[in-house]
Structure formats: C-alpha cells, structure tokens
Amino acid sequence: MGTTTMGVKLDDATRERIKSAASRIDRTPHWLIKQAIFNYLEKLENDETLPELPALLSGAANESDDASEPTEEPYQPFLEFAEQILPQSVRRAAITAAWRRPETDAVPMLLEQARLPQPLGEQAHKLAYQLAEKLRNQKTASGRAGMVQSLLQEFSLSSQEGVALMCLAEALLRIPDKATRDALIRDKISNGNWQSHIGRSPSLFVNAATWGLLFTGKLVSTHNETSLSRSLNRIIGKSGEPLIRKGVDMAMRLMGEQFVTGETIAEALANARKLEEKGFRYSYDMLGEAALTAADAQAYMVSYQQAIHAIGKASNGRGIYEGPGISIKLSALHPRYSRAQYDRVMEELYPRLKSLTLLARQYDIGINIDAEEADRLEISLDLLEKLCFEPELAGWNGIGFVIQAYQKRCPFVIDYLIDLATRSRRRLMIRLVKGAYWDSEIKRAQMEGLEGYPVYTRKVYTDVSYLACAKKLLAVPNLIYPQFATHNAHTLAAIYQLAGQNYYPGQYEFQCLHGMGEPLYEQVVGKVADGKLNRPCRIYAPVGTHETLLAYLVRRLLENGANTSFVNRIADNTLPLDELVADPVSAVEKLAQQEGQAGLPHPKIPLPRDLYGSGRSNSAGLDLANEHRLASLSSSLLNSALHKWQALPMLEQPVAEGEMQPVVNPAEPKDIVGYVREASDAEVQQALTSAINNAPIWFATPPQERAAILERAAVLMESQMPTLMGILVREAGKTFSNAIAEVREAVDFLHYYAGQVRDDFDNETHRPLGPVVCISPWNFPLAIFTGQIAAALAAGNSVLAKPAEQTPLIAAQGVAILLEAGVPPGVIQLLPGRGETVGAALTSDERVRGVMFTGSTEVATLLQRNIASRLDPQGRPTPLIAETGGMNAMIVDSSALTEQVVIDVLASAFDSAGQRCSALRVLCLQEEVADHTLTMLRGAMSECRMGNPGRLTTDIGPVIDAEAKENIERHIQAMRAKGRTVYQAVRENSEDAREWRHGTFVPPTLIELDSFDELKKEVFGPVLHVVRYNRNELDKLVEQINASGYGLTLGVHTRIDETIAQVTGSAKVGNLYVNRNMVGAVVGVQPFGGEGLSGTGPKAGGPLYLYRLLSSRPQDAVGVTFARQDAERPLDAQLKTLLEKPLQALQQWAAGRPELQALCQQYSEQAQSGTQRLLPGPTGERNTLTLMPRERVLCVADNEQDALIQLAAVLAVGCEVLWPDSALQRDLAKKLPREVSERIRFAKAEQLPVQAFDAVIYHGDSDQLRELCEQVAARDGAIVSVQGFARGETNLLLERLYIERSLSVNTAAAGA
C-alpha cells in the first residue's frame, strides 16, 4: 500500500495544543492528527452535515495550499513506529476494546440478547429433542462414516489409545521412509491398553480394529511377554511389519476419506452430487497449512484459481445461494499475514484476494473468507472493507466472511459488518461458527501474559454467544445473508424458530462439516411432506490429499472427540436427551446461581496473570496486534526517546558526572541513546567498603520484607515496561517482541525469588555469603542482570553489579527501579566499565564472597582461576555461578511436521539475531526429509525483514557491535573458503538496505556441514549450521553432540515417543525441548542453565539457585522447598529407588557403626536425585525438572571416618566415587560390600589433572584445600566446583552433586 507524507505548517501554539491533547489521552500527536483526518473524512463521505463547512468554504477560496514538500529531518527514534499506528472508526475501536474483556462483563449482556421468548423457547426445545432422538435412534451410519464414527467414539481423546490413534493419523501418511513409519506404528500401538476396548462397542468394525490393534500391539511390543505374542511372531515372522503398516495405513486413509470430500476438486465435485440431489449445497475448502514461503502462497493461489474455475463451471448459473461456493484461508495466500506486516499484506495479499473475488464474481459463486486466529481478525476486516468498496464488485452479494462466536468481540464485529454492508450498499454472506482454535488461543494468552482471553473459557458461554449473534444477523435480512454453521441440535432448533415460519429462498442457510454433520441435517434438508424441515444446508467440504489433511484432521478430532461437543455426546447413550438439548441460557443462569455471579470463568482455566497459582503472579505482556496497545506504546516510546539516558556509577553516595562516553544504537549510528562513565578505581574501592558495611543491615532485614521490596520492584518494572522497551530497542538492538519478553523475564525473576525466600527462608538459619559481584551479559542486559541481582538480594547478600560495557543504560534503569522499591543504596551498587578494568578489580578483591557471571566459557574459566585460592572465614571456597554458551543442536526426524519445524528453527536460530545462549547452532536433519525441509527453510528466511528494530515490521535486528559482526563474518568466510555451501537470505527492501550499510547487521545464514564435529566453537549470531544424519545413526549423532563438551539446550522434533526417550535419555544437556522452539526459557517453568562447558549450575529460575548464595542453612532446607512444591504437584521418584541400592548396601554393612548408619539414613532422606517434578506452565505444554546425579565425584580425605562420610553422601545421590589411589582408600575399599565397591574408581595423584570428574568433596586443612582448588581450576574443560569441610563435618551439600535437567514438551503437537 503506497504512502505519502503531506506536510502541514502549524504555528507553535497549535503544535503545543496538539501535543498536550495527545498526551492527555496517552497517544502521539501523529495518531491524533491521523485520527482527526480519518474521522472528518468519514463524516464527509457519509454526507453528514458539518455546521462549520459553509463558513469555512466561503472564506477558503483565497487561501493558498500550504502543503509543503517533505524535507530531510534529523533521525527521530520511533517516528516510523508512530506512523504505522492505524486510525479507527468508533465501531472498529469498539471491536478492539472488547478483545479480552472479562467474561463477567460480557456474559450478562449476552444472556439478555440470547434469551428466547417463552413460547419460542419451548418450541425450540421440543424440536431439538425430536432431532436428537431421531439422530440417536438412527441405525449407526452405514459404511465408512459409521465405522469411523464408532472408532472415534470408542477411542475418545481421554484415553491413551485415542491419543495414540490421533498421533498416528496426524503423522503416518506424510512420512517418506518405511523405517520411520514402522517405528511410529510400533511406538503408538505397543503401549496401548487395547484389551479394555474389546467388546465394548456394538460395531463389528471397532471390535475387529481393536482385535487387530491388540494383535498388532502384542506383535510390535518390544517385550514379548506372552506366549500369544511369541506364537504370532513365529507365524508372521519377518512379513509382520509390512502387513501391519498396510493395515494401519488403510485405517488412516479411511479416517482421511471420512473428513475429506475428495483428493482433487474434480473428485470432490463428483462425490458431492449424491447429497446435492437430496438438496444439500457445498462450500469447498482447499486444505493446507498457512503459507511460510512465497512459493507456498503462489501454489495456494493457483489451487484456489483452479478450484473457482471448476466450481464455477459446475455451478452452471445456479447463483450464490443455490449453487456451490468456495472458502479461502488468507494465511495460505501470504507468508506474512499479520498485523506487524500490515503494509505488505495490503500491498501483496489484497490484490490476490481481489483477483480471486473477481473470478468468483465472473461465475457468480459465493466466496467466503475463513476465520483464523484472533490476532488476525482485525487485519482481515481491513481487507474486507477495502474489497467491499471495489467498483468492479459493486452490487454483487457473493462476498462472504466468517465470524467466531467463541470470541468476545463477535457481537461488535457484527455491528461493524452491518454498518459495512450499509455503507457499501450490498448484502454480505456471514457464516457464524463457534470457533476451532480454542486451545491455541488459551495457550497464546497464557504464554504472552495477556490481560485475559479473546475467547470464552466455558463452552456454554460460546453457545449463548452464538444465539445472541444469530439474533443480530437475522434482524437485518436486507444486509446480511446468515449462514449458521452448527452441529448442535438445540442451536439448530433455536435458529429455526427465531427465523420464523415464513421462510423464503435466500433468507438464510445452515452449514455443517463434511463427515460430521450430515446425519443431523438429513432431517432438515428436504420437503415438509417428507417429514423434513425444508431448510437449506451447505456442507463445508475440505479438498486435498491425505498428506495435507493433518492439521485439519487433528482439529476435527479434537473438536469431535472433546467430551463437551454435541457430536461426541449424542453418541453417548448414558446421557439423557433433555440434558443434551438443554437451553444454554438456562444453563448459564443455573451456574450463576451456584457460583453467585454470572459469567465467572472456568475454575480450571486461570487467567494468564494467575497461571502459577497463589505463589506468584505471571508477568504481564503486551499484545502487539492490538491497535489500542500499539497507540499507547507509541506515545511512551516517543517520550522515552526525548530523554537523555545516563549510566554513572551508582554508589551509596552520589558521584560526580566526569567524562562521559556516548552509547550508540547498533542499528543506527546517528542515534545517541545516552552517555556512560566508567567507574574509577577509587569508586570500586568505595563500593566494596560500602558493600561490606551494608551487608549486615540487609541480612538483618527479615526475608518477608526483602521479598516485599523485590515484589515492589517487579510492579514498578512492569509499569515502566514501555520506557524500558525503548532503551532495549535502541541500546541492545532488540525487536519489540524481544524487548517485551526481556522485561517480562526480569519481572518473573523478581517474583520467583521473592516467593521462595518469603516461603522458605529464616534469618536465624539461612545465612548469606556477604558481598556478591554480578557480571551480566549484553544479550539479556535487563533480564539476566535483574535475575542475578534479585537472587543475591533475596538470599540476603549485598550486590556489586557490573553490567556489560555495551549495555550500561538499561542496567542503570534497572538499579534505579530497585532503589525506588526500597533496596538501600549501599546494598545494591552499579559499577559500569570494562571487564578487564572494573570486572577484574571487583573479582580479585579478597572481600568478595561470591561471583555470578554470564558470558563466554573462556572468561568464566579465568574468573574461576582468579578466585580459586580464596576461602571465606569458615574456610569454604568462594562460589562462582557461571552460565556460559553452547553448541546447541536440534534433531529432526522424518515424522516431524515440516511447517512446524521451519517455524521453530527460524525462532530458535535467528530471533534476537541469534544472540541467545540457547540459540540453535546446528540443525540435524534425517536424510529423507533434509532437502524438503531446507527448501522450505530457505523460502521462509527470504520472507524475514532485517533492519532497525524500532519498526514493528522488523524480524531481525543488528548484532551488538562491529566486533561481533566482524567475528561472525570471518567465520562465514572461513566456511566458504572450505567449500561449504553458504546460503544467506533476507527480504529485499530498499529502505532496510540503506540501514544495513550503517548498522551492524548480519543476514540470516545457513551453512551445510559434513558432520557435527566440524564445528569447533560457538558462533554467536544468526548463523545456522546443518548436518544430515542417517536414521540408524541417531545414537552416534547424540554422542557427537555430547562430545562437544557443551550441554546447554537441545531440541527434538519427532512424533515417536521412543525417539524422544532415546534422545532425552542420552543427551547431556541442561534444557531439552520437544516439538517446539528451544529459546525463551520461562522462569520457574523451564529453569535455565547448562552443564559441562555450558555452566556450573544451579539453574537460574530454579529451586536450587538461592541455596548457592548462602554460607549456611539447615540440613533439610532444600527438602523443605521441594516439599512445599510437591504438595501442589505430583512427584515421580521411581529412579531414586534404583539409584540408592549401593547406599542401602553401605547402610547394612555399617551395622556396627551407628553414626555412619544414621548418616546414611539422613542423606537418603535428603537426597533428591532421581526425582522428576512437574512444573506449572501454560496449557498445551508439559514441563518437568529432573534431578540427576553428577557422573563422578572426586572425594579427598585423610582418614577413614571422613572417607565414609563422603562415600555415604555421594552414594545417596547416585554418583560414582573417584578416590586417590592411596593405602587408606585401597584398604577401605576391600572391606566394603560389592555393590558399593563397584561404584568406586581409583586414580593416582599424577593422573588426577586428566581424570574425568565433575565435583569435588574435601575434608581437611584449609591450606591443602586452597591448593586443591587451584589444581582443579587449572584443569582444561568444564569448571568443577569444590566443597571443602573441616575433618568430621557431616553437613555436606548434596544439591551440589545434582545435575538439573529441564524438559519442555509441546503436547499440542499432534494433539497429544
């Protein structure tokens, strides 16, 4: 959509009036001017009388046009963003305002609108009862439809078998290789409890299928327990799997055919004739996912064009009401159909929509714009508005639009559509559906922390909304042709009564889904004389190959198999018909009586804010598709850009300004974001003294008060989100969505650690370390910075914070918020500067009691060596918590859905310009699907926009600075020189290209490697390496990934549970992700941190982190924290029992040593390794935290008592023990029982530097401990932590021996 700038000269007074008026309503002057022009134009175009016009016109003739030519203005941050905000009419603003309104506001209003007058209500109930009774008493539908319906009824989604069938249906037909197909069948069938379904269904087919699945299940089970399976295996032998594959394949195709009208449009038109003869009509839908590439969009365009020609010819002049029509999905016609890409959608998608509509008009067939996700509703209305005013379509009534009753905005959308029909002088076809994206709408709102849901949380509210909306549509027959899509007998009957008895052709129609609604509507379509209702029904008929059926089929199965759906309940003979056809208005009123208020949300679906229960709030997000939120954000951003930000040292006493350095926007060198001054040596010393002096005051503050201060900081930070976003976008090159996520993560850290100290800590028993240095990175300059500080403060430590030198301004704002919340000035201090000066001065000071660092592995190693020789007054080594990088891989097999893989790869590899510790670095594709996946990935990369993140349209911003850009480009060049295939792509845009020359941009890059181990180190930027692997060598691939030494994140995309178990069971990685992206770990949901070269642990935003920041605490402290969590959610401790067998052997052996026996018992009770906990999180996702034992612990003691104390602790956790090869240890080992001695390894003193161990426990003198710490720190490889104790001490910290593994599974993939 072309735009132009029309300059208007204003005097200063008028300009100030506009600015002042705009700020009063939290809008920008640009918005106010645009909105005023829009409103005035609308009035003029609608011929409204404007009293000021006559006077103005008479005096205006002599005035000259003062529109000036646009002039080159200095760079103003966020100006383009302000210009992208759209003006709205009153009706459109009402739609936006209703987006997430509380159900308690929306439902009472709907009840009045949906209520049927007394006689009509009774008639509707009577008719509904008759329809339902006939439907239930009908012989089960014959043939294929009956078989499939019985099968779906028997295997409901609440059963494991139902889910297995759905996973099979979703994936089987698209897998190219037989081996993976067989693995999927084996995986889904061998674990099913098929016996429980035998004989339960009256349908022969279901019983036959169940027997087949039972035999198959036995046949493919990995454990051949029964003689039945052995004999079957003998009979079928090697020919078994192909037979089974054929059988299952046939069953899946059968299900496919049940829901799809034909594989091609010609086949579908032929199949439709039978029901057309009975009076049914059709609307055809070309199946497929949303387009991700230009090629996808073009293919769908051609498919729609061909379909319109075919349908048009078949229609043969029957017209829009009597003849067939087509439904189109706008997301299939453009790869970037979203609010952020508004101009592209209008310039590129709109002409396609217009040409399809003109083609439909040529044949006079109806064309319906399908409804999609809630955030696409308003942009679809803009496209519709434009279409309705096309001169070539004037007077034609075939334009159709779909609206969803489950959306709270639906009634307001109808008001707008009626107005649009009036203004464009046409009758619109409006299909009213209930809505098919409910699960994903709930999940998205929860994940993004939005203020509410766009949809109702109770099915019955949607039913009420549907009736209220139906009434509105029926009230304007001259403007709207209503199309009621429902399978619910009560809804059908109510609409039949509301529409009146004097029906005329073209008044309205019903609609149903192919394969689901025909049995009900066979009672509706046809002559009254034949006992029918004589009302038309149009069948929504999907067309496409079985391979394109997947997403559609799963949506239908979810909808059909959901136990609240009419289709599911009608088949349940135990449910009384009266209940089945109950009036939803009465049902809601009954609920209101029980609950004391109408419209209360579903008790099991908390608002996004309350996702984590009463313990803590979820951080609030910001919806970048909501026009009101965008307008308000734009105003705040322009204000934030006027502020000259500063980062001075923030000490207990104010400091002088001194010589300041500019902080420059990496995307635009002309933009000076603010100024920074490095802390001097004297200021560092002053800060250290203050930290020491203030430490006792802060520690003495009760944990509840410390928690309250952190909670206050969270509230302040959330309220300042737009301002903080402004700094993040300009200083760190963050896109808006990344900036929102960053502020939210910082807020979540404050809530999480505050909650933990409030509930679990006591100053009498939990003692802090003392002054702690926090060194944070530039890639998460607010989130990680705040996370480190919040944890240290929560635990009672004073903090010296050194932000990354590239991002001091956002850090200064973060500290200002903490001070405003009530943290005393000497307790938190900010020391901007370089690592080699300020960082080195802080960490090398003897008075520092702990170091928290996020950054490179090399710097972490230097820090560890720097502090290794320092012990605290109790003789304990100084702790370093380091979170470093990773060579993160994603493994994709041929059962994965390519579209989903590509979306997740784009987010994981290129979001934040690849500058995340967790970002995907190596994509591992199974050979059979590599080419197909890469073709789609390259196409999707070409659709990404790279440029200034201050625009809403930008997907990929700059890398942090020129040095980072140089390093990345050097790597790419080196790979090219080695002959590797390098592909770089980004959307061509002249405006963006100008910025690329000045800013530090690197386009998304794809490099194909021969093998994983070709990559020797992490490349921190938008560079994705690809390797292909053979299905049979998956274990070898995981070994290579482990061999890199890093262990931060790993992704798996597969539909095979066995593969998930195989990878997650053998990968040595801190954060695992299944069938989802692998970035954006959420505090407390996916605790974050790696192992090996990727970090020391414990995980940030996890239950163990705060314990690392204490100098002492009760023995059972960790257990208390876990017990509190376990009271809310289930605990799986199966593995713990297995791990403790050697400890039990030691306990029995220690019969004559009561102290050791008691200690074994104590450690056994305290040990948490081998436990798996379910963590709170959004719907459609399963998050767990598993505690595993470290592999091998070096135990150093000079007497038998201490050696046994160490042995008991290590065995309680389940690790191997590494003993120095000395007489003491050798003699002791001989005495121990076999189960214990098998867990012990020996190493000679000179071999220790090269021996593998990942933790150390020492009892003895402090001088030797210091020496040991230095030796361990001097080793190459991962940082290993050392616990040091005086002789005889038994308070060993078992949590230091755990490895934490976080696993996040997208359970919505394949409807699992």
Swiss-Prot record:
Pathway: Amino-acid degradation; L-proline degradation into L-glutamate; L-glutamate from L-proline: step 1/2; Amino-acid degradation; L-proline degradation into L-glutamate; L-glutamate from L-proline: step 2/2
Domain of life: Bacteria
Region (Proline dehydrogenase): 228-574
SUPFAM superfamilies according to UniProt: ALDH-like (SSF53720), FAD-linked oxidoreductase (SSF51730), N-terminal domain of bifunctional PutA protein (SSF81935), Ribbon-helix-helix (SSF47598)
Renumbered residue ranges of the record's region Aldehyde dehydrogenase: 653-1119
GO molecular function: 1-pyrroline-5-carboxylate dehydrogenase activity; DNA-binding transcription factor activity; proline dehydrogenase activity; sequence-specific DNA binding
Single biological process term from Gene Ontology: proline catabolic process to glutamate
Keyword line: DNA-binding, FAD, Flavoprotein, Multifunctional enzyme, NAD, Oxidoreductase, Proline metabolism, Repressor, Transcription, Transcription regulation
Cofactor(s) listed: FAD
Catalytic activity: L-proline + a quinone = (S)-1-pyrroline-5-carboxylate + a quinol + H(+); L-glutamate 5-semialdehyde + NAD(+) + H2O = L-glutamate + NADH + 2 H(+)
GO CC terms: cytoplasmic side of plasma membrane
Catalytic activity, EC: 1.5.5.2, 1.2.1.88
Catalytic-site annotation from UniProt: E883, C917
Pfam families per record: Aldedh (PF00171), Pro_dh (PF01619), Pro_dh-DNA_bdg (PF14850), PRODH (PF18327), PutA_1st (PF21775)
Job of this protein: Oxidizes proline to glutamate for use as a carbon and nitrogen source and also function as a transcriptional repressor of the put operon.
The family this protein is said to belong to: In the N-terminal section; belongs to the proline dehydrogenase family.
PANTHER family per the UniProt record, alphabetical: DELTA-1-PYRROLINE-5-CARBOXYLATE DEHYDROGENASE 1, ISOFORM A-RELATED, DELTA-1-PYRROLINE-5-CARBOXYLATE DEHYDROGENASE 2, ISOFORM A-RELATED
Protein name: Bifunctional protein PutA
